[in-house]
């Protein structure tokens, strides 16, 4: 440890003078504080001397500082770097055996090879991330352009739909509704009429067969004639939904008699037809039609023979 210098002695004397002069008003500096101040000054001086010695030693070892910096930066030769690059392209993972073999072939230490591979993997990952980011960015831009185009198409179609709705009138909708209601009513009426016709025609099916048969005594061939008031049209009967008690005679209906005994052309029945009707239809309700009670209501007469007149 060196002796205190002149500067330290002067500061010590100034401190003592300050302590004695301000003894009444300010506290005096203690001995411990003085010792600490002296030790700090000594340490600063020693550090300065050590720095100077180190600077001189470095200058002696390396006369030119630029040469020292160049040696630190250039640790691997160009051939060594190329060989390491080829090894990295083959496999970026480094196991202990491979590390020792590469270090022996290139004349390097295994630690240097491991550090170089580690740094190279870090750079490779960075470049890979940059490539992936560029690809994703391009894809994002393409998708965004497609989205913008689709949005424009959507807006155009929406505007066109609005224009068409404005041009579309509202009256045809009401007309279509009324047409549907009328069609429904017509369909209901047609179904009801079909049901009535079916129910009415089922009861008279047997009688229609009997009257339409030519071999039957009740067929149109056996009729001589009815008055016009007793004729019923087939079409009108089908429309009303019921069948007539007397069949339509169609072409088998005979015209008015031209008998001389009959005064004027009249319609009537023959005796044979009346006799057949009274015999065959004795137990039928239709026989009441030819009874004596209703004879006065019939607007026709019949001729018993050609020589007799009207009764």
Curated annotation (Swiss-Prot):
One of its GO terms (cellular component) is nucleus. GO terms for molecular function: DNA-binding transcription factor activity, RNA polymerase II-specific; sequence-specific DNA binding. Residues 127-171 are annotated as: Leucine-zipper. It comes from the Eukaryota. SMART domains: HOX. Its main location: nucleus. It is found in: Nucleus. Residues 1-74 are annotated as: Disordered. Residues 35-54 have a biased composition (Acidic residues). The keyword Nucleus applies. Keywords: DNA-binding, Homeobox, Nucleus, Transcription, Transcription regulation. GO terms for biological process: positive regulation of DNA-templated transcription. InterPro entries: HD, HDZip_class_I_plant, Homeobox_CS, Homeodomain-like_sf, HTH_motif, Leu_zip_homeo. The keyword Transcription applies. Expressed in seedlings, roots, stems, leaf sheaths and blades and panicles. Residues 69-128 bind DNA. This is Homeobox-leucine zipper protein HOX13. Belongs to the HD-ZIP homeobox family. Class I subfamily. Gene3D superfamilies: Homeodomain-like. Probable transcription factor. CDD domains: homeodomain (cd00086).
